[in-house]
Regions:
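Core segments of cupin and vicinal oxygen chelate
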Residues: 2, 9-52
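Short amphipathic alpha-helices within nucleic acid-binding modules
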Residues: 21, 83-88
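Vicinal oxygen chelate
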Residues: 10, 33, 86-117
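Eukaryotic phosphotyrosine signaling hubs
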Residues: 5-7, 70-74
Length: 117
């Protein structure tokens, strides 16, 4: 058996706001927008061919799977458009070794790095 794809699940306050952020800033594609019980929704975003983000409301996770509601994982994205993304997202933050960090509208931080491969 082998792994064929990866989805990182992020638990956020507002699924739509965070989805809009990734669609606007990283040109993510919405690949699923599905209902959950009690009127909640989940959105899956294709970031690259190898990575999908699954956005879930924190309130839903707290109610149905509280054992997994923990800290946000540290995500590192690689790009060939580093300078353009730094101009868009860097907000004056320092660059270090070809990386910079940026925040989404809820204050979750991510790292962007120059693609060196």
């Amino acid at each position: 058996m082998s792994v064929t794809s990866t989805r990182v699940m992020l638990y956020v306050e507002d699924v739509q706001v965070i989805s809009d952020f990734f669609v606007t800033t990283l040109q993510a594609k919405i690949v699923a927008n599905e209902p959950l019980p009690e009127g909640y929704r989940t959105i899956n975003l294709q970031i690259t061919d190898q990575l999908t983000l699954g956005l879930f409301p924190k309130a839903f996770i707290a109610k149905y799977s509280p054992e997994v509601l923990g800290p946000v994982p540290s995500l590192l994205f690689f790009t060939d458009d580093f300078d353009a993304l730094y101009a868009q997202l860097g907000d004056g933050r320092p660059q270090m070794n070809g990386t910079f960090n940026f925040a989404d509208p809820e204050g979750n931080y991510y790292v962007m790095a120059k693609n060196t491969t």
